[in-house]
């Protein structure tokens, strides 16, 4: 089956749904392809306290459901499918999905997001949202005056640890090596902070916790040399071993940086291909927040409208 559209949005997180809302209100009749994880990363987030408009915290899945309904109510067609292949060599752009549907689009907004790199250990997924996080800015507030562990040794880990000292009583970094890869200025700030301690040459083997109520109580760590294990008591575990953008579909077509994030024109969502725009975490390695993703989704829709009206 072949379907034609003016605007095709790939991805259904805050960026994709915001783009859909603005595109629909501009009478562009957008089609949005949900992807494998409808709603994006917020669907695995419990309490959301930093999205404007809500005096009390809201649940991530509920927030994304509201965005989805809003997008549909203003005229977006949302398709439960995922993209398998993209051809951006000429307009109309061609997109093939898992259901064997072929789309031809005059413009495309890429909102496929990014995902945290996880440890891949037992109980990590079990305590996701119940003490395990990959975003200190999002979840640090919930650990006021509590002990937390940060896993990692790069810029992300050090920055997360420094941020968490604003909330936690103690921050312990567990790193598998005997030195950090982080920038020297960040390391200097970290070593000067009395709230932070570092456990070198260790890896996290297991996250320990309770089931009623579900909560983290500590991490079991192992020395990479001696193989001895020990327990570090904590209420939260922040995994900071990097993020990876979901950009494999667009490789060798859209220009990306060394970390495979899509490069956009400064102050814009335009990519190197005219008529193709990118919004949200897929082009943002710095902020990675729902509100910034939504903002760039809005920008992409407005820029797509302007492009189509040329």
From Swiss-Prot:
GO terms for molecular function: thioredoxin-disulfide reductase (NADPH) activity. FAD binds at residues 34-41, 281-290. Its cofactor is FAD. InterPro entries: FAD/NAD-bd_sf, FAD/NAD-binding_dom, Ferredoxin-NADP_redctase_2, Pyr_nucl-diS_OxRdtase_2_AS, Thioredox_Rdtase. It catalyses: [thioredoxin]-dithiol + NADP(+) = [thioredoxin]-disulfide + NADPH + H(+). It holds the Pfam family Pyr_redox_2. One of its GO terms (biological process) is removal of superoxide radicals. Disulfide bonds join 135-138. It comes from the Bacteria. One of its GO terms (cellular component) is cytoplasm. The active site is a redox-active disulfide bond. This is Thioredoxin reductase. The gene is trxB.
């Amino acid at each position: 089956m072949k379907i034609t559209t003016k605007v095709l949005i790939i991805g259904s997180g805050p960026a994709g749904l915001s783009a859909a809302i603005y595109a629909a209100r501009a009478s562009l009749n957008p089609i949005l392809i949900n992807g494998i994880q409808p709603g994006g990363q917020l669907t695995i987030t419990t309490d959301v306290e930093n999205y404007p408009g809500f005096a009390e915290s809201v649940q991530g899945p509920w927030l994304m459901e509201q965005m989805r309904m809003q997008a549909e109510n203003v005229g977006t067609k949302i398709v439960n499918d995922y993209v398998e292949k993209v051809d951006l060599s000429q307009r109309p752009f061609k997109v093939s999905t898992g259901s064997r549907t072929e789309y031809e689009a005059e413009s495309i907004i890429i909102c496929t997001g990014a995902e945290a790199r996880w440890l891949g250990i037992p109980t990590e997924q079990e305590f996701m949202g119940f003490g395990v996080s990959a975003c200190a800015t999002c979840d640090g507030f919930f650990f006021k005056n509590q002990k937390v562990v940060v896993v990692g040794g790069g810029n992300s880990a050090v920055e997360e640890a420094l941020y968490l000292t604003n909330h936690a009583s103690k921050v312990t970094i567990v790193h598998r090596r005997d030195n950090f890869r982080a920038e020297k200025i960040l390391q200097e700030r970290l070593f000067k902070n009395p709230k932070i301690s570092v456990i070198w040459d260790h890896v996290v083997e297991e996250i320990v916790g309770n089931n009623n109520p579900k909560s983290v109580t500590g991490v079991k760590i192992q020395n990479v040399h001696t193989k001895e294990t020990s327990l570090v008591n904590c209420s939260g575990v922040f995994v900071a071993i990097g993020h990876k953008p979901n950009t494999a579909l667009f490789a060798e077509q859209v220009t990306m940086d060394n970390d495979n994030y899509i490069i956009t024109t400064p102050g814009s969502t335009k990519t190197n291909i005219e008529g193709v725009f990118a919004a949200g975490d897929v082009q943002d390695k710095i902020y990675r927040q729902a509100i910034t993703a939504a903002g760039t989704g809005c920008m992409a829709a407005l820029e797509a409208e302007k492009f189509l009206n040329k």
